[in-house]
């Protein structure tokens, strides 16, 4: 048995099966949300489910490659990856394509790419090395506050670059950073101080950083959850949140059936009132709730929760701190996306356009998601393989990371 095949057999297949189940359900949900759309436009919305399958097929080799290669490469590749991520964000500011007020995409060879997704992927890798390896590489960084400053710069620069144009991608950095900080041996008092400082900054960001339409979305959500419906502009910023809530609330336990089969003339809410270009991406959870009901939504969230719990389990078995931090960062990112997407589809959180992992349509996000799943698998596959050898020099043990 070759070492590579042995690694392949050592993959966490329960996690793979859970992921494949979510991906299959996501493709089916996208089909439900888009197959009936007009096919005369250049977007070909009725074929989005096929496009999603292509993106999955493109991303699976990245998953397999990342899983079978020992993740120790992140120690030397983290800086180039991070700089490339920042370079992508700079390119976005210069040549980005603005869609519905969001400057989040660049067009490369006719394909829209979202640099912020690659930036957060690189950021997770960089933060794992900062929290896990920096104290060993330079003893001065054994002081927690120094590591926190470096990590804050690593996360703060890309977050600040995207938050004004792409609020959702900017906010994802928060839970990712806090989760990795918690696992990265930073004293709890520093986390409390950081959270309190962030709370003080929120009003400044709201009034002086966010655009008017972003403020309006936050205001609309606040009015809806506090039952001030007279202040909600149902023909403007409150249009989509209102109809998404109606779609979810009217679904019942069993829903209106796949392809809206239980509704006369298939006249479901999502077909009539959801934005045609976003029903299969940002509002896919609302479509699932309406089509498959409460049980479908619970089944979906249970599947995602099972995947995240398995990720946490894998983190406990990591051979080193870097692997543990990688897994925690990925789990935190998936949780943030799931929490925000489900929350905005239920009318509990503002509409800021974060895709639902494994379910929402999206090329860039799908490839990043599958690559990060591969990184999690690499931590599991190599959990019993020592990344270093012990050597003795002058009667004292030290580690040599260049040996395998």
Feature-to-residue mapping (PLM):
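Short, Lys/Arg-enriched, Gly/Pro-containing loop segments at transmembrane-helix junctions
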Residues: 382-394
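Extracytosolic (periplasmic/ER-lumenal) interhelical loops and adjacent juxtamembrane/interface segments
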Residues: 238-257
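Juxtamembrane loop-helix boundary motifs flanking transmembrane segments in multi-pass membrane proteins
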Residues: 1, 41, 45, 236, ...
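Transmembrane alpha-helix interface/packing and boundary motifs in multi-pass membrane proteins
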Residues: 157-164, 250-255, 289, 349-359
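N-terminal membrane topogenic signal
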Residues: 1-19, 74
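Transmembrane alpha-helices of multi-pass inner-membrane enzymes
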Residues: 347-385
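Hydrophobic alpha-helical transmembrane segments of multi-pass inner membrane proteins, especially
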Residues: 18-24, 28, 32, 42-237, ...
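Long extracytoplasmic/lumenal interhelical loops at the membrane interface
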Residues: 253-295
């Amino acid at each position: 048995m070759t070492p590579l095949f042995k690694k392949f057999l050592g993959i966490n297949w329960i996690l793979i099966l859970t992921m494949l189940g979510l991906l299959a359900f996501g493709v089916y949900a996208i089909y439900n949300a888009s197959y009936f759309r007009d096919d005369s436009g250049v977007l070909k919305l009725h074929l989005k489910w096929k496009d999603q399958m292509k993106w999955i097929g493109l991303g699976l080799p990245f998953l397999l490659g990342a899983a079978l290669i020992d993740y120790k490469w992140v120690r030397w590749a983290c800086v180039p990856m991070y700089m490339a991520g920042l370079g992508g964000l700079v390119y976005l500011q210069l040549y980005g394509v603005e869609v519905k007020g969001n400057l989040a995409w660049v067009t490369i060879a006719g394909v829209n790419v979202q640099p912020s997704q690659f930036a957060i992927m690189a950021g997770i890798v960089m933060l794992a090395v900062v929290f896990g390896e920096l104290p060993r590489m330079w003893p001065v960084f054994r002081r927690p506050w120094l590591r926190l400053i470096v990590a804050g710069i690593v996360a703060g620069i890309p977050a600040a670059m995207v938050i004004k144009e792409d609020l959702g991608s900017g906010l994802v950095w928060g839970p990712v950073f806090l989760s990795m900080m918690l696992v990265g041996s930073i004293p709890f008092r520093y986390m409390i101080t950081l959270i309190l400082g962030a709370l003080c900054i929120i009003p400044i960001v709201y009034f002086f950083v966010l655009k008017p339409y972003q403020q309006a979305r936050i205001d609309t959500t606040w009015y809806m959850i506090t039952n001030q419906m007279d202040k909600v502009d149902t023909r403007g910023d409150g249009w989509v949140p209102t109809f998404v809530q109606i779609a979810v609330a009217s679904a019942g336990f069993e829903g209106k059936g796949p392809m809206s089969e239980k509704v006369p003339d298939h006249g479901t809410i999502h077909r009539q009132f959801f934005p045609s270009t976003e029903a299969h991406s940002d509002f896919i959870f609302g479509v699932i709730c309406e089509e498959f009901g409460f049980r479908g939504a619970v089944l979906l969230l249970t599947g995602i929760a099972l995947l995240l719990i398995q990720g946490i389990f894998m983190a406990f078995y990591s051979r080193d701190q870097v692997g543990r931090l990688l897994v925690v960062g990925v789990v935190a990112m998936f949780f943030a996306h799931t929490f925000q997407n489900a929350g905005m589809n239920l009318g509990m959180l503002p509409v800021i356009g974060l895709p639902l992992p494994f379910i929402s349509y999206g090329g860039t996000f799908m490839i990043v998601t599958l690559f990060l799943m591969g990184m999690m698998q690499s931590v599991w596959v190599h959990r019993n393989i020592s990344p270093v050898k012990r050597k003795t020099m002058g009667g004292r043990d030290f580690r040599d990371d260049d040996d395998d």
